């Protein structure tokens, strides 16, 4: 099997495994993340209503001014703090972390740790 196809199949299996366990609700919405080479983004989703409650990204003006590059651990940690602050304003205290096909390592771990430190509970 080609190396890229093998990587893709592993990611798809991991995404399905994680996503089958998670369903966001109004009292405990789903915090899904998107990690690219240049940026890091997340959104808090209520799956029952089918609505996005809030979002944060390295593309936001407040984050963009503070970081040099959007695709590193420092930027992900800053997004974690920002989403925790926005969640507190919106009245969301606990969420379910949906890491998708990403391993809990590096930027994903930095994001989760920063969000926990800022008061968001997983």
UniProtKB/Swiss-Prot annotation:
SUPFAM superfamilies membership: Translational machinery components
Keyword annotations from UniProtKB, A to Z: Ribonucleoprotein, Ribosomal protein, RNA-binding, rRNA-binding
A Gene Ontology BP annotation from the UniProt entry: translation
Matching InterPro entries: Ribosomal_uL18_bac-type, Ribosomal_uL18_bac/euk
Signal peptide: none
Keyword Ribonucleoprotein: yes
Function, in words: This is one of the proteins that bind and probably mediate the attachment of the 5S RNA into the large ribosomal subunit, where it forms part of the central protuberance.
Protein name per its UniProtKB record: Large ribosomal subunit protein uL18
């Amino acid at each position: 099997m080609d190396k890229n196809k093998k990587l893709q199949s592993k990611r798809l299996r991991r995404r399905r495994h994680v996503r089958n366990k998670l369903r966001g609700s109004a009292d405990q919405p789903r915090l899904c993340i998107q990690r690219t080479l240049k940026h890091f983004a997340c959104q808090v989703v209520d799956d029952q209503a089918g609505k996005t409650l809030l979002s944060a990204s390295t593309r936001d003006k407040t984050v963009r001014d503070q970081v040099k590059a959007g695709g590193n651990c420092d930027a992900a940690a800053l997004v974690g703090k920002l989403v925790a602050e926005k969640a507190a304003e919106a009245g969301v205290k606990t969420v379910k972390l949906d890491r998708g096909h990403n391993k809990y390592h590096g930027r994903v771990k930095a994001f989760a740790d920063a969000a926990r430190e800022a008061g968001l509970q997983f």
